[in-house]
């Protein structure tokens, strides 16, 4: 089909694709590149069909410019008037049309990613001034060689004038706790002619000047750490259980260190309890409070000595009579303001005008425990013929309000001789 002449163009749609129309407009320009507005202008002047419905075909033409590799976008130089970028043909798309005819396109031009990067790096086939490639990158081939030569020269210069620097010296050795390490001497500014190994001996601290002091400091620090670990682990724990997080060997070493150093934690129970209670606690073995008795759990006999030795403030008390007897047998002087357990008696008594008793007495009998065959004399259950001790032995002011409450309790105890003792807790 022969190429139609300009005089034969009519208002009918021309047989050219948008890619052919754009390539035709670019090749007819003097600089082989046109802005988008000039491409529109060329098409509308050449083909009257595109003078109508401009918005439709212009949108399609813009999409073809953006999504086809045969068109290259060139930024506008600052000295060029106008706005918008230029569009040019790819240097390698010359054979895209058969025999230079825009009627038929041989195949869609596709630029490989390696070739595209090679083109932008300066290895384009077009020479300066011979085509669009000359406008894009006129000096890239020489620039690549020059850059390589410059890089090689810089590396050669750095190799001759700047020897490779040694790795930075290690940080000064940190001696634990109180041993202060001398600060390293400041290094002079590095000069190219001076080797970098010279200021290193100055920066090394004199660690070998006092080997005896360092060993002694390390030994003292290790002993202090072991004592602290033993103290933290042993406070509030039984002696037969190792501290949390320490093995058997570590626990034994910590216990030995704690026993030899005599370290006492500031919050140890020996430092918290007042001096007035130490005589009662050490002599009679009677504690100030009984955690297990608070909870209502009986303490076995084989654990009473362990609990009394490890936890002086925790133990077992069963009755006021047993406590008073033990304190009297030990011959420990107890002040008039303290009871047998070291608890102020005045705190347990209330004024006579109060209606509630000072000592909480259970109204309903508690569930009976399994019968006990033998009980100590101090803990035997009183029979019906025996009289209960008057409440005035504990506090005279609390006798009258507690009398009507203790009578049904005594009757219930007399009926159930086989039940165990339900002692009343007389401390706070």
From Swiss-Prot:
Top-level taxon: Eukaryota
Q: Spans of biased composition, class Low complexity? A: 193-217
PROSITE patterns (UniProt xref): FORK_HEAD_1 (PS00657), FORK_HEAD_2 (PS00658), FORK_HEAD_3 (PS50039)
Q: Which InterPro entries match?
A: Fork_head_dom (IPR001766), FOX_domain-containing (IPR050211), FOXB1_B2_FH (IPR047389), TF_fork_head_CS_1 (IPR018122), TF_fork_head_CS_2 (IPR030456), WH-like_DNA-bd_sf (IPR036388), WH_DNA-bd_sf (IPR036390)
GO molecular function per UniProt? DNA-binding transcription factor activity; sequence-specific DNA binding
**Pro residues bias (residue ranges):** 164-174, 183-192
Q: Where is the composition biased (Basic residues)?
A: 136-163
Task: One GO cellular component term, please give it.
Answer: nucleus
Instruction: Show the segment(s) annotated as Disordered.
Output: 118-217, 408-428
UniProt cross-references to SUPFAM superfamilies, sorted A to Z: Winged helix' DNA-binding domain (SSF46785)
Q: Which Gene3D superfamilies match?
A: Winged helix-like DNA-binding domain superfamily/Winged helix DNA-binding domain
SMART domains, alphabetized: FH
Query: Where does it live in the cell?
Result: Nucleus
Keywords annotated in UniProt: DNA-binding, Nucleus, Transcription, Transcription regulation
Give the DNA-binding residues.
Answer: 12-103
As for what it does, the entry says: Transcription factor.
This chain's protein is named Forkhead box protein B2
């Amino acid at each position: 089909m022969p190429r139609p002449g300009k005089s034969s163009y009519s208002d009918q749609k021309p047989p050219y694709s948008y890619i052919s129309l754009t390539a035709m407009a670019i090749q007819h320009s003097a600089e082989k590149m046109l802005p988008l507005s000039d491409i529109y202008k060329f098409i509308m002047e050449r083909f009257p069909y595109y003078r109508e419905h401009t918005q439709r075909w212009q949108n399609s033409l813009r999409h073809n410019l953006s999504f086809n590799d045969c068109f290259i976008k060139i930024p506008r130089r600052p000295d060029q008037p106008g706005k918008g970028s230029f569009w040019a043909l790819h240097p390698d798309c010359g054979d895209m049309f058969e025999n230079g005819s825009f009627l038929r396109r041989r195949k869609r031009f596709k630029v490989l990613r390696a070739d595209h990067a090679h083109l932008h790096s300066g290895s384009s086939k077009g020479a300066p001034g011979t085509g669009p490639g000359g406008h894009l990158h006129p000096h890239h081939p020489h620039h690549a060689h020059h850059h390589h030569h410059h890089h090689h020269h810089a590396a050669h210069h750095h190799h001759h004038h700047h020897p490779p620097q040694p790795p930075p010296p290690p940080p000064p050795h940190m001696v634990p706790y109180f041993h202060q390490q001398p600060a390293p001497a400041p290094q002079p500014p590095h000069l190219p002619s001076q080797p970098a190994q010279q200021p290193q001996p100055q920066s090394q601290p004199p660690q070998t000047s006092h080997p005896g002091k360092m060993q002694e400091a390390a030994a003292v620090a290790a002993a202090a750490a072991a004592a602290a670990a033993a103290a933290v682990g042993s406070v509030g724990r039984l002696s037969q259980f190792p501290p949390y997080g320490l093995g058997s060997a570590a626990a034994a070493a910590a216990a030995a260190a704690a026993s030899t150093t005599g370290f006492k934690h500031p919050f140890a129970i020996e430092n918290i309890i007042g001096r007035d209670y130490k005589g009662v606690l050490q002599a009679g073995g009677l504690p100030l409070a009984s955690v297990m008795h608070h909870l209502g759990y009986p303490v076995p006999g084989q654990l009473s000595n362990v609990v009394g030795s490890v936890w002086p403030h925790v133990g077992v008390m069963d009755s006021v009579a047993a406590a008073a007897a033990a304190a009297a047998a030990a011959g420990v002087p107890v002040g008039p303001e303290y009871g047998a357990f070291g608890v102020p008696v005045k705190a347990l008594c209330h004024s006579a005008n109060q209606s509630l008793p000072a000592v909480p007495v259970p109204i309903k009998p508690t569930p009976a425990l399994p019968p006990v065959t033998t009980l100590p004399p101090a803990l035997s259950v009183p029979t019906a013929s025996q009289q209960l001790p008057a409440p005035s032995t504990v506090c005279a002011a609390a006798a009258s309000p507690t009398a009507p409450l203790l009578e049904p309790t005594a009757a219930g105890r007399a009926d159930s001789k086989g039940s165990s003792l339900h002692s009343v807790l007389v401390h706070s």
